[in-house]
């Protein structure tokens, strides 16, 4: 996939941010796995990330964790972090997140989906609309954290892909945020129940500001 790499020098701030995210990689993957209902302990998750397997964990859960690792490693690459946080980037992240589960996990959803625990049924996404909307969000005159949150929540609510939308949306938002040298965004284990509740409310029409304030306060780590 030609993602339009440019070889320009990264600022010291962005290089520090890459190190900061790498130093927290295992914890971030663990937190994302918790949000997905993957029942591994932190030591098991660490083991999977380091060795690719662990006794007593289902193949599905191992694959999900390895996919998260690959998607994070992808965005933390020095070339990739210089690429635009656009629709093509989102699709590539989704492809990595869905690897081994769907043949075309990075392709826009062409089938209806239902989301458990909510009456909200996302309409079928239209590629040109998603491309345009992501560009619009990104070009707003707002703080990077506000833009990252909006990118994340727009992609989740749109359910751009057949599966892996929460995982892909969070990693995509981090691609944008880290490229701005503004920390990272992950829902910590202890904030997951509250996040799920706010997510349903957001899907059902609650304004973005509500879950946005929660994400900014509880899920944003800066340095």
Label each region the model flagged.
Residues 1-223:
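FIC/Doc superfamily catalytic core
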């Amino acid at each position: 996939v030609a993602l339009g790499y440019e070889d320009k020098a990264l600022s010291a701030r962005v290089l520090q941010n890459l190190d900061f995210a790498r130093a927290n990689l295992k914890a971030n993957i663990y937190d994302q796995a918790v949000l997905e209902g993957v029942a591994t302990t932190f030591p098991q998750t660490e083991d999977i990330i380091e060795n690719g397997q662990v006794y007593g964990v289902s193949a599905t859960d191992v694959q999900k964790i390895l996919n998260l690792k690959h998607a994070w490693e992808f965005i933390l690459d020095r070339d990739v972090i210089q690429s635009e946080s656009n629709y093509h980037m989102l699709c590539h992240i989704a492809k990595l997140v869905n690897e081994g589960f769907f043949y075309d996990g990075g392709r826009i959803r062409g089938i209806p989906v239902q989301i458990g625990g909510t009456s909200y049924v996302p309409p079928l996404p239209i590629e040109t609309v998603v491309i345009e909307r992501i560009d619009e969000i990104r070009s707003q005159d707002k703080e990077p954290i506000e833009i990252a949150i909006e990118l994340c929540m727009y992609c989740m609510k749109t359910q751009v892909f057949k599966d892996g939308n929460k995982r892909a949306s969070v990693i995509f938002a981090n691609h944008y945020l880290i490229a701005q040298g503004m920390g990272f965004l992950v829902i910590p284990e202890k904030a997951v129940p509250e996040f799920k509740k706010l997510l349903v409310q957001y899907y059902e029409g609650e304004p973005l500001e509500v879950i946005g304030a929660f994400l900014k306060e509880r899920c944003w780590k800066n340095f």
